[in-house]
Amino acid sequence: MQDEGVDMKKLLLRSSDEVRVIAPSCSMRKIDSSVIERAQERFRCLGLNVAFGDHVYDEDFLGSASVDKRVADLHAAFADKKVKLILTAIGGFNSNQLLQHIDYALLKKNPKLLCGFSDVTALLNAIHAKTGMPVFYGPHFSTFGMEKGIEFTIECFKNTFFYGRCDILASETWSDDMWFKDQEHRQFITNPGYEIIHRGDMVGMGVGGNISTFNLLAGTEYEPSLKKSILFIEDTSRMSITDFDRHLEALTQRDDFCTVRGILIGRFQKDSGIDMDMLRKIISRKKALDAIPLFANVDFGHTTPHCILPIGGMIRVNVDRKCITVQLHSSVEQLPE
């Protein structure tokens, strides 16, 4: 539940603010230098100053810095009064290694904007569960090193973090290519828009992320509540339809799943083989989902572009306008039971 002591208006970005980049999953060594330089330039154009954690380039035989070093960079970013936004560098597989070593009291005392996606799902949801602080599921720092097709993502970033409100309509185009390997020969696909599987407006607290990573938190003290929630879920091209089916089933078996007020499903990557017909069949077989409004093909996850969704903040969905609204200043506590 959102910490009522956090004044989100005071956390909004202003010109000359510092963005701190940390690598709680994989090392920044995996990111090409041209991508890093382009991302830095993008933030300079936004009037923001970029700094990096001391250990973002460290890596062991599994491609990450040690747990102690990754936690140290996280703590340093939250403790530094100059830092206003913390961005994760890239995803990976092991941010959950940090959870039992984090000083959550330090984080709660020094609230910041924190944003990332994919494996960072574990870190984001744990921080929200332990502190009540809203955090954000959205682009990594490396995402901003994309040469083409970044405009939608930047607009969402500005509206959310500078102005505190973003009305998210479906993007005009999307892409699922390996842009970080080939910036020139991009393939952009016309977006048919949100897929409305169950009609209905939604109002609730955002929670979720990468579904397979989110479910790693099940039964732990780092698992966030689903009470009054808009649950948003996505996964990578490695996620098959059978994998998605069982992960979704696991969520429906939670004691608090009956309190979920809506579900948003991020766009599946092409290599997953999951299409809308398959998804509708999976959804139709789950009675726990029958009465829950549900949108799919939403612009978050492992395709581009990226919108930004709060974990522990308000999400509103207007089915007639086909619009998802994120408003940082709204309190989830004001929602009726």
Curated annotation (Swiss-Prot):
It comes from the Bacteria. CDD domains: Peptidase_S66_mccF_like. Gene3D superfamilies: Class I glutamine amidotransferase-like, LD-carboxypeptidase A C-terminal domain-like. GO terms for molecular function: carboxypeptidase activity; serine-type peptidase activity. Disulfide bonds: none annotated. The active site is at S118 (nucleophile), E234 (charge relay system), H302 (charge relay system). SUPFAM superfamilies: Class I glutamine amidotransferase-like, LD-carboxypeptidase A C-terminal domain-like. One of its GO terms (biological process) is proteolysis. It is an enzyme of class 3 (hydrolase). Keywords: Carboxypeptidase, Hydrolase, Protease, Serine protease. Its EC number is 3.4.16.-. The keyword Plastid does not apply. Belongs to the peptidase S66 family. This is Putative carboxypeptidase TP_0688. It comes from Treponema pallidum (strain Nichols).
